[in-house]
Amino acid sequence: MKKPLLIFATEGEAAPVRVARPDLDIAICGVGVVESAVSVAKIIESMCPEAVVLCGIAGAYSDALKVGDVVAVSEERCSTLPSVYRKSYLATIKLPLTEVVSNTVMAVGAEAMGAQIENMEGAAIFALCAAYGVPCAEIRTISNYTTDIREQWNIPAALEALVKAVNMLF
């Protein structure tokens, strides 16, 4: 894979990677499905990337994944719509990481739909990349369990693992 455009929801997630890898192209999409969809459409139209890799932190539904684990999302499921309208979106780039299914949610507490992790942007990015014909992948590091209160999240450990994964992959 040629050097992809790395997309992060927040500058806080991107900053450690920017410092470690100033040679990589990085963009910020914002948090949630609406903001990320609008931002990534503009990013794809203006930058015309050959590939996109969404990077960031995620919550795990069970302790089968540990805080700091790095995973590649193979499929995004969106639980925010009634079941008759739900779709799944697939990664089109394979990464040499443990693969998981992710649930894109707009609020904590949405049903897991058979997913191992949840995030707030993945389905939107996968759908946009498919619409534009841009190959895509998603890397997530586990910062918390979905039942944890915010004070229990370990964002520093997750970001450290994310930097290591980016260095290994790109």
Summary of predicted features, one role per range:
Residues 1-5:
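Extreme N-terminal starter segment of soluble prokaryotic enzymes
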Residues 9:
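Internal glycine-rich, Lys/Arg-flanked active-site/core loops of soluble domains
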Residues 14-170:
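Glycine-rich phosphate- or other oxyanion-binding loops that anchor nucleotides, phosphorylated ligands
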